[in-house]
């Protein structure tokens, strides 16, 4: 309501004064809401916002985080649903996970903005068209792509597991030295659980590609039973950052992490050089996060300009790859041209392009994804 009153006042002043400022000179607060860990908020607030505000002195970027994992994106979804009947919505730009993107597109909560931004031509990934089985083409641009892997302290782990089977044997011999966050507090634990189901349940390919068959989940009981037994010998950490923190302090020797967070923590001195990465077979999921514009964003055009900056090859190179250690969200060839070879190659020290090609998986289509998370809560926790 406050936004509408402010807009009304601005219009009234414009009518009253023949030499009034243009709409472009009106002071605007661009509300950018992001799910994910604190590094997501830091990226918007400390990196993107100053650049955008420098080129748009009439705009103040306000960055707010809603928390890690799908729960963070769910809060954004609930906010949009609550405002659905309003003429304008408070959120101008949102950064969300795949699961929420499909839901929001299906419920007509997002604008099909990609055709209207100049950087739309750099959108090339399959995940920009299909999000866990839902057609999202035209509604999303990936902010980045990321991957989970197993981080391990090479001073403590001499025989590094190469597969889930190897990991189970290692944990049997080294109880309470592996840690993960279950399915709470972040997606690194969720990814580990999904990778477990891919390893020990039949037909992982069907889970990723569909079609959905509600009866398939009944075939996962042995995999969940095996995971429940596994969990008796591991440490449950507080979340994505919690796993990294325990690795850094030597409280655990191994655990699943996001590759980007791992490299950032290591660059900041919070992880010793002895901690390294291994993408184990048969594979673990990664995912993008998406820039979206809500269907009734109050500042939709400014939101599009903000996303154009954020998805430009220069910003993707300097911010996404060099500063925050993500894989680029737009076409990698456009980004690589902006970087020196050493910076580009740093992304692939432990997890190679070949690893990503053979063991980097997608998350399941949404209904199977829901079934896995519900199955974990009922049969593992």
Set out the residue ranges of the language-model regions.
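Extracytoplasmic ligand-binding site segments that recognize negatively charged/polar headgroups
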Residues: 35-45, 66, 70-71, 90, ...
């Amino acid at each position: 309501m406050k936004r509408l009153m402010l807009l009304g006042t601005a219009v009234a002043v414009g009518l009253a004064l023949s030499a009034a400022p243009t709409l472009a000179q009106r002071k605007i607060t661009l509300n950018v809401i992001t799910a994910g860990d604190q590094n997501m908020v830091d990226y918007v607030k400390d990196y993107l916002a100053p650049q955008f505000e420098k080129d748009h002195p009439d705009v103040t970027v306000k960055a707010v985080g809603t928390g890690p994992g799908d729960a963070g994106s769910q809060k954004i979804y609930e906010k949009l649903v609550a405002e659905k009947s309003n003429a304008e919505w408070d959120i101008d730009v949102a950064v969300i996970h795949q699961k929420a993107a499909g839901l929001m597109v299906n419920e007509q909560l997002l604008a099909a903005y990609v055709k209207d931004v100049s950087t739309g031509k750099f959108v090339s990934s399959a995940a920009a068209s299909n999000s866990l089985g839902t057609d999202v083409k035209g509604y999303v641009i990936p902010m980045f792509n990321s991957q989970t892997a197993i981080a391990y302290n090479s001073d403590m782990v001499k025989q590094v597991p190469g597969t889930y089977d190897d990991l189970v044997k290692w944990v049997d011999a080294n109880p309470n030295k592996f840690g993960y966050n279950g399915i709470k507090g972040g997606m690194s634990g969720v990814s580990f659980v999904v990778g477990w189901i891919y390893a020990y349940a039949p037909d992982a390919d069907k889970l990723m590609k569909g079609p959905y068959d509600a009866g398939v989940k009944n075939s996962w009981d042995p995999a969940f039973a095996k995971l429940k037994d596994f969990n008796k010998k591991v440490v449950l950490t507080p979340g994505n950052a919690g796993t990294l923190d325990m690795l850094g302090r030597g409280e655990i020797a191994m655990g699943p992490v996001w590759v980007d967070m791992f490299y950032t923590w290591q660059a900041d001195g919070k992880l010793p050089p002895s901690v390294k990465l291994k993408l184990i077979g048969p594979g673990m999921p990664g995912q993008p996060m998406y820039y979206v514009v809500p269907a009734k964003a109050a500042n939709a055009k400014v939101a599009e300009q903000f996303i154009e900056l954020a998805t430009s090859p220069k910003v993707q190179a300097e911010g996404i790859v060099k500063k925050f250690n993500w894989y680029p969200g737009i076409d990698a060839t456009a980004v690589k041209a902006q970087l020196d070879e050493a910076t580009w190659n740093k992304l692939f020290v432990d997890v190679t392009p070949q690893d990503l090609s053979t063991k980097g998986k997608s998350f399941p289509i949404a209904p199977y994804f829901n079934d896995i998370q519900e199955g974990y809560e009922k049969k593992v926790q």
